[in-house]
């Protein structure tokens, strides 16, 4: 019994000493400065540029609104410019001075509000040429308005990208590097969004925003051998009177018809920025029972670099 008491006393004293040591360490003069500097170094390390290599084909959700950075063949194309896009890219080390283009799924405010911030952040990263922005008909006044907001910022400009050839069922060719192509499907009718398809080395990524139609998703995937998708969706189950975004059931049904091998649902309405919304969304998506479909927030990645598309969800 005495031995047991001695052991318990020793353990108690050790715990008290450890707790006391931590308390003294955190409350010593200058401790707050050390903590701040340590956290600042961690933030700087996370924001350090981390571009994908030339063989990679990946897409990263960069904000709670429309913002997906696609990196393929050493090139980078941003789909959507929602609120917080620049901050999201910077925080993940994905802001690039050599961003090849921004392509807008639609011209609604939530898809374009981040354009001025992107222009300024890309300039700060070292960009010198105007940032090209592609989008549906009506994009010119949107870019003019964004440039007007940047009028006081020397050297910061956006320019309207010129789409290439309309290839009928194969979509509108928006961007072609000779290795990577970006095609748009739909978006010719007022209020309708574009669905984009990015192709690299026989693999395809379909990206659909809130204003997309199910038929556009199916059309965009036509002829693809290995395909995955990042699809926006809304849920009237989670938000009353939600009618501004393609219903999750419709988006997933289209993804099934398109035979997408992996499906990342993002951005979503209601927004995953709302506490508890992301887990609720994961339950909703799981309830649709579509193989390979998951809901993810900012930082989630879909990777097509290897043989089979893979999704990595952010913590």
For the regions a language model picked out, list residue spans one by one.
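Sec-exported extracytoplasmic/periplasmic mature domains
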Residues: 120-124, 148-151, 256-257
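Core dinuclear metal-dependent hydrolase active-site scaffold
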Residues: 3-10, 17-95, 162-222, 298-315
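Cap/insert and terminal regions of metallo-dependent hydrolase folds
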Residues: 2-23, 211-300
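Active-site neighborhood of phospho(di)ester-bond hydrolases with catalytic His/Asp-centered motifs
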Residues: 78-82, 99-111, 134-136, 205-211, ...
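Active-site metal-binding motif and surrounding structural segment of the metallo-beta-lactamase
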Residues: 83-134, 162, 222-230
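Solvent-exposed, acidic/flexible segments
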Residues: 78-79, 92, 107-112, 136, ...
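Extracytoplasmic/secreted envelope proteins and their assembly/folding machinery
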Residues: 86, 96, 115, 119, ...
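Acidic/polar short surface loop at catalytic or gating sites that assists cofactor/ion binding
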Residues: 32-33, 136-167
């Amino acid at each position: 019994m005495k031995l047991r008491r001695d052991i318990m006393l020793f353990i108690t004293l050790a715990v008290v000493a450890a707790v006391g040591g931590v308390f003294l360490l955190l409350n010593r003069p200058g401790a707050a400065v050390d903590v701040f500097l340590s956290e600042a170094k961690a933030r700087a390390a996370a924001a350090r540029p981390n571009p994908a290599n030339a063989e990679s084909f990946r897409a990263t959700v960069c904000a709670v609104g429309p913002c997906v950075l696609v990196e393929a063949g050493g090139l980078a194309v941003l789909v959507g410019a929602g609120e917080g896009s620049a901050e999201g890219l910077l925080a993940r080390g994905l802001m690039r001075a050599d961003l090849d283009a921004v392509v807008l799924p639609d011209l609604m405010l939530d898809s374009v509000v981040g354009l001025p911030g992107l222009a300024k952040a890309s300039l700060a990263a070292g960009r010198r040429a105007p940032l090209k922005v592609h989008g549906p008909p009506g994009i010119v006044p949107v870019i003019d308005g964004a440039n007007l907001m940047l009028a006081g910022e020397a050297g910061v400009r956006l320019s309207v990208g010129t789409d290439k050839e309309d290839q009928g069922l194969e979509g509108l060719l928006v961007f072609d590097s000779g290795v990577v192509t970006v095609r748009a499907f739909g978006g010719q009718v007022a209020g309708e969004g574009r669905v984009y398809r990015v192709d690299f080395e026989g693999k395809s990524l379909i990206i659909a925003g809130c204003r997309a139609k199910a038929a556009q998703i199916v059309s965009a995937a036509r002829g693809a051998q290995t395909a995955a998708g990042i699809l926006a969706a809304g849920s009237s189950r989670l938000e009353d009177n939600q009618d501004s975004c393609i219903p999750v059931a419709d988006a997933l049904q289209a993804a099934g018809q398109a035979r997408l091998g992996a499906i990342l649902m993002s951005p979503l309405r209601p927004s995953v920025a709302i506490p508890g919304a992301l887990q609720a969304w994961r339950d909703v998506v799981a309830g649709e029972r579509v193989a390979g479909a998951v809901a993810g927030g900012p930082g989630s990645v879909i990777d097509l670099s290897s043989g089979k598309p893979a999704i990595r969800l952010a913590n």
